[in-house]
Amino acid sequence: MSNIYDTANQIERELRELDEFKALQAAYEEVKADEAAYTLFKEFQGFQQGLQEKQMRGEEFTDEDAEKAQSIATKVQETAVINELMQKEQAFSLVVNDLNRIIMTPVRDMYND
């Protein structure tokens, strides 16, 4: 029997070869090539991370957080290359979600006996 971590590493290598990953990678390169879009994307990522950290600490979101989220979301929606990146990320996430569903089958089966 092979080592499960060897299998996981093989899956990681195969994910990099998927069309969905290659499309995501190409879309990210397009964002990076557009300085304004890349700056906005990094701001968006940082803001999202900050909100997640706030949520994990049990802090409430402020009106200022909501206003900034709306402002950044509007700018992101108006930026075609970022929208394309998000679409490609969503397509790749579907593959990852399918893999997670498959991997978690033993646990689901156990609880559904």
From Swiss-Prot:
Domain of life: Bacteria
Family: Belongs to the UPF0342 family.
Pfam families per the UniProt record, alphabetical: Com_YlbF
Transmembrane segments: none
Name under which the protein is recorded: UPF0342 protein EF_0681
UniProt organism field: Enterococcus faecalis (strain ATCC 700802 / V583)
